């Protein structure tokens, strides 16, 4: 799966309010640059960073107009100046 398809799937999740949870797990990591990573997440509030020795995770929060928020959690590692995304989790929560 390439970055363009992943962006489309994430956009679809935000548009389709009936979806409450979505996980994208990659057999082979999705390799992106720092700029592509920033483009993928947009400009949300980074609420949590977990620095495991091997796998990092960033948690972003997006506030919707209703009483819900969307959390985006990305599990990845960095190697040779690139970000290797292993999994992306999206889910909605009540505020």
From Swiss-Prot:
Pfam families: DUF1374
UniProt cross-references to InterPro entries, sorted A to Z: SIFV_Orf14 (IPR009804)
CDD domains found in the cross-reference section: AcrID1
Top-level taxon in the UniProt lineage: Viruses
Gene3D superfamilies: 3.30.160.300
NCBIfam families: AcrID1_fam
Protein name as it appears in the record: Uncharacterized protein 95
The species this protein was found in: Sulfolobus islandicus rod-shaped virus 1 (SIRV-1)
């Amino acid at each position: 799966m390439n970055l363009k398809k992943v962006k489309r799937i994430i956009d679809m999740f935000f548009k389709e309010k009936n979806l409450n949870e979505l996980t994208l797990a990659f057999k082979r990591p999705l390799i992106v640059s720092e700029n592509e990573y920033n483009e993928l997440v947009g400009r949300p509030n980074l609420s949590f960073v977990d620095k495991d020795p091997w796998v990092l995770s960033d948690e972003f929060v997006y506030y919707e107009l209703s009483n819900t928020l969307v959390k985006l959690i990305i599990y990845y590692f960095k190697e040779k100046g690139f970000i290797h995304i292993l999994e992306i989790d999206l889910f909605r929560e009540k505020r």
